[in-house]
Amino acid sequence: QKIILWSASLVPSIYFYLFNFDNINIIFFTSLIFWLFFAVFHLYSKFHLTNNFNVILGTILIVPLWVSVVSLFLDNKLFLLFIFISIFIADIGAYLFGKKYGKNKLMPNVSPGKTVEGVLGAFFLNTIFACSLSFYVSVELLIIVAGTTLITFLSVFGDLYESLLKRQ
């Protein structure tokens, strides 16, 4: 068991050394791994979160979020703005299309108000945003559409996961 634990602790060290990770990237990488393990653990276990655990979890996870926002702000303000606008457009599209056309519930046990039509509206509005943006920036349309698609997917998934945590 000691050899397995030692090996498991050595792997990230080698990875960070080989890829020249600095402190910010270590925070990002660690939080990504933590989120992935926590999400899988939480979804497949019968573990219920207590209020104290929620406070600790929120405190741990707010640091990487803040570091990433500050890092993006310092490196590329327009990219950070693009991310926020894309998230806002996804939320607005989901709300408007869901209210107007929403008939099929996405996950009624997790978030009763979210509909498949709302999600499609989020993707549709963000695709229009990507096409409009491609006229003003020197980035290929396919890359912008891929970016807004990824952001929309993560936005919807994040909303659903947050609703799941809220319901417990």
Residues of each region from the PLM?
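Membrane-embedded alpha-helical bundles of polytopic integral membrane proteins
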Residues: Q1-G113, V119-T149
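Short cytoplasmic-facing helical segments at TM-TM junctions of multi-pass membrane proteins
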Residues: N109-P112, L164-Q168
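Short helical (or helix-break) motifs at transmembrane helix termini and adjacent helical loops
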Residues: I89-K99, S155-K166
